[in-house]
């Protein structure tokens, strides 16, 4: 049941990620963030003694992740406009931005893994890391299954 919920959530987010205004993106991210918290709490078990610390850090993490998410959505929108006629220069510029966004996301996850481990313990931090990577990978898969390769006809 959890996999079905996650799949539906990812599909909903992916479908709505294209060609939206910043206001719509922010609204979607807030809705997704609330639903995502339910998924995270289904897998991360901080226990009563660490719940408040975990939730505070997770909320802080989500705010920063959502800012990075806006960049990823903008990059997907750019790709949607250019994929069928993308030049080498456009591909290089786009990939530079994609790789930069991925690196920033990875740094953010590592940073919050360390913060959560310090505030709770290594098990809770590992659970956070695992569920976060699972969700991000699932979203990435859903997106890439639905977009064509550069120059594909």
Predicted regions and their residues:
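Amphipathic, charged alpha-helical segments and their helix-to-coil junctions
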Residues: 25-27, 31-37, 43, 106-153
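Sec-dependent N-terminal signal peptides
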Residues: 4-19
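A short hydrophobic/aromatic micro-motif that marks alpha-helical segments and, especially, helix-coil
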Residues: 15-17, 62-65, 102, 136-139
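Short hydrophobic "helix-edge" motifs at membrane interfaces and signal-peptide entry regions
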Residues: 4, 37-38
């Amino acid at each position: 049941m959890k996999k079905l919920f996650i799949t539906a959530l990812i599909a909903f987010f992916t479908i709505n990620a294209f060609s939206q205004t910043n206001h719509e993106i922010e609204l979607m991210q807030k809705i997704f963030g609330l639903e995502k918290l339910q998924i995270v709490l289904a897998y991360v078990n901080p226990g009563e003694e660490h719940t408040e610390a975990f939730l505070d850090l997770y909320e802080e993490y989500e705010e920063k992740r959502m800012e990075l998410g806006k960049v990823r959505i903008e990059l997907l929108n750019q790709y949607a406009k250019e994929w069928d006629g993308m030049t080498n220069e456009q591909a290089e510029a786009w990939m530079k931005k994609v790789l930069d966004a991925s690196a920033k996301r990875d740094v953010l996850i590592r940073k919050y893994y360390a913060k959560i481990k310090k505030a709770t313990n290594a098990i809770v931090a590992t659970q956070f890391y695992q569920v976060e990577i699972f969700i991000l990978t699932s979203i990435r898969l859903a997106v890439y299954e639905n977009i064509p390769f550069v120059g594909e006809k």
